[in-house]
Amino acid sequence: MVAAQNTYAPAIRFDADDRNDQAIIDARNIAVTFKVEHGTVEAVKDISFQLYRGETIAIVGESGSGKSVTARTIMGLLTKRASVSKTATVRFNGDDILKFSSRQRRALRGNRISMIFQEPMSSLNPIYTIGSQIVEAIRVHSKLSRKQAEARALDLLRQVQIPEPEARLKQYPHQLSGGQRQRVMIAMALSNDPDVLIADEPTTALDVTVQAQILNLIRDLQKKRGMAVVLITHDLTIVKQFSDYVYVMQHGEMREHNTTERLFAAPNHPYTRKLLASEPHGSAKPMPENSGVLLTANGVRVSFMMRYGGLFKPELKELVAVDDLGLTLRRHETLGIVGESGSGKTTFGQSLLRLNEPVAGEVIFDGERVDGRSRSQMRPLRSRMQVVFQDPFASLNPRMTIGQIIEEGLVINGLGKTKAERLERVRDALEAAGMPGNILSRFPHEFSGGQRQRIAIARAVALEPEFILLDEPTSALDLSVQAQIIDLLRKLQDERGLSYLFISHDLKVVRALCHRVIVMQRGRIVEEGPVEEVLNRPKTEYTQRLVRAAFEIA
């Protein structure tokens, strides 16, 4: 591993004795139910936790565990369909905030207790400037004049280390990057010097290097202000390096809690042990010695024409997304492509399948030129080249049954002479992907995220391809489900001799699945080689930064 300083600032470790003082938040017996069409659903079942001044606690668990519902209960942000048990109490500095009036809660929220969310774009108003939104957050809870609030807003942007803060005040949310928008949300959350900051998956949608920057920023601001932090996440690397105390939730129940050090060293509950064991591990199986070349690309360049300027005199400019790229992919091989958002990795991958149009370069698949072919000329190759996307819910037609979704590809490519033959291939593909063959009449919304991704993989393998482009196929999944999909991809490759092009920002998954890796930055390849060599001994400063952000470094 790269010898370097810690990417994350170290957590201030609390002793068990430090938790004997009065808690700033003392939550007891929280139970939350939601009204649904045919009754009620228990989202949170009788949980309790404490938070102390200056401390960071992590509430961890997979999707549906109830961790975000717990946070929203504290903030008073539950929907009208939700009801909190009458025996529940949430004491903030000794006062039960569940008994507060709406007015009292509004005075507390964003003032003494603040919250930042996973996707800042959904929390920022797209029609107002950044400056006006921060000023509004300040003036709701203070008597500052507009001029004083504007000065305070500028100071906050400086504190969260946004470049060119004066210019950012006049910009709109869509003009900022994801990391910059999250910094704005932190500035707004801290605008009234809260005692508690609740961070609900604050870095999940961000690149690994930006994740490290945001978490270090929260830690630095916490030290300066003496805040307590509630961190809600499913990322155990972040939990280990960032929190002092951990609560583990599953199916709305508290499974285990302990200091971070003790919980990671000796987890007691089987579910906690399962979570810790779900971190991607292992490596790709060695390729057969006689593996020939399946796909090559040379000098690939992709650009888009973008509109710049005003409404009445827009100017068209060429934006070069990828420039002069090449690769070689062998049969039975998994080649990873990694890089931050905007690096061009997805654009490059899709250009190899002609899902977007390269303006230059050549792509050769199994000895045949792919570039320059018309749609009709590409059709014979489509069944041999398949793709699996990040979000299966977006790529599976919600109006079609699972059977129809998978059979559609067979019909289009003329595979299976009769309906019975096609349905047999559909069932075989589902079973190969770890799904039962009796789900053909069900719809995508009836399945979990992991099950939908298995269905998307089944749709791809039903056509018996030689090459599959996997575009972030595990990034939206919980850790344990992610591990299952990695095992499935390994199994299918071993059984069917598949070649994968695996696009990801998660270097842990890349290490577990790939033989070789390409590192991209700003549309160019900056480093490539065997996965262990690149991740253990990265040559470029950019790759070193990616590796430091992705792995725990002692």
Model-based region annotation:
Residues Q171-L176, Q180, F443-F447, Q451:
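Conserved ABC ATPase signature
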